[in-house]
């Protein structure tokens, strides 16, 4: 019995730790299928040995925690989890239990299980009053100011409900394209999110709502808590209520009559799953008749009238051929598994992340091992472990590299970090090249035509050895055009124009482009806005820097150390000499010049194609001066589509729907810029 109790305690400890990682850190260390398998093992043991089952067991309490960063709010009605079904038999048992209750179910409603962060939103006087995360199910975090930045969530509902307190629940998520864009924008030294679910949860818990707005969260709503107070009798009718009040509701929600139809829907969801722009990890099945919910009842953790069917994890095995090491622009060493190519979730996988050496050591991963691969949140290929039964007899443990794969400098670990680093930040070829690649990238100085391949060729030809050399390429024109770079005169001219245009960038883009550790695009803009000039920033002290919103001690020290380095001071001086702007340029530079066109006011716009200024700047103009709404997709409700060069399918859809089209040249002429 002692062994049984010890095993139960071990499983509880694991699940509590994993819950903390998932709900608080937004950074789970194990995939869903491992968590689910461990939970099932715990439940089975507790059922067989009920004397060891406690009220604080993860099998009993709702998973989740309440962060101390936000005000704690008690839910008026507990926000419970859902029990899981993993196969048809589980669903049939769920149905049989409901049928045994001898009530009219009025069928089932089948919904996609969105992989995000659960939220409850309260409306008073028909206005959004408060938004609360699920937390531990009893208490949640007040994230109202962050929720107000999400465009999918209406700030007001129909005035006829002003005498009611309306509570709706749903899931905040991040679409795939927004997830990729956000991760691209993160500083390399920042920890990138593994999947959209972690990104959505981490973003919604940010203390800076400007970051929340910038990262473009979305939300599907799926439950009207007090539907019966409004005279609504079925869950499917409540879904229509949400649609009528401008909440975003999934188009995949269907009503069926029997559990066999539910099972058929699983196949439908499986077929469309890979085509969706957002993550789903299963489907949710709810009894349609709201009037029987209380009769069917609840456990301390789950409602009995609903269940979640979890998609099985697709784990495949392949041979580890090689572990590849690389160095990034900050000197960070990465470990990547090269595997025998294998099909996983519709795409051929040849590489998977290994994070760092500690991960390899913990999993005891060796060359030629048969390793298990899965996609974390259906996005990034990850290594799940090793099939030890297939390990070769002569295999040996993998040893960490000692020297930089580029310059052979001895690697170090700073301040007990898990990552190894190359400290030869001025002499390492790969670091220097990666710095230049980052500097010219779209989210930094946006120098078009300077591809990674061209940068490598120019570096090897001694044309560019550092960032400042980019601004002297014009004098090498004849050599470049007559050498084996395969660059024609027009392409070179466009490249030089793009380099010259980059000199006009506002200070925050230059600051971002320097790639200073812990200083990403968001913080760079706040710092630039605060200090206005490079000179003022270079002379800022620790206290002045940490007074900038979101600038912590690490970022402040990193900035001070960077500007105290003579190499960097020399770089700033060189850039200043060639005319690179060193001042903050306010977003709103059009006040004195812009013409306000009355017919554009309070309209709905969609932007497509390329322009001489960024889409964000155009969006700012439309919202600031015209009080317009800017949407991502064209519909019958769109008033205007603003068209630049290389416009895509949005233009074609606008033509089909008869939406008014504004060409870029007319737009520039109308607005006097």
From Swiss-Prot:
The EC class name is ligase
Q: Which residues does the entry assign to the active site, renumbered to this chain?
A: 113
UniProt: NAD(+) binding residues: 32-36, 81-82, 111, 134, 171, 286, 310
Organism name? Ureaplasma parvum serovar 3 (strain ATCC 700970)
Q: What is this protein called?
A: DNA ligase
GO terms for molecular function, please? DNA ligase (NAD+) activity; metal ion binding
Q: What is a biological process (GO) this protein takes part in? A: DNA replication
Q: Which UniProt keywords apply?
A: DNA damage, DNA repair, DNA replication, Ligase, Magnesium, Manganese, Metal-binding, NAD, Zinc
All copies of the BRCT domain together span: 595-673
Query: Which domain of life does this protein belong to?
Result: Bacteria
Q: Which reaction does it catalyse?
A: NAD(+) + (deoxyribonucleotide)n-3'-hydroxyl + 5'-phospho-(deoxyribonucleotide)m = (deoxyribonucleotide)n+m + AMP + beta-nicotinamide D-nucleotide
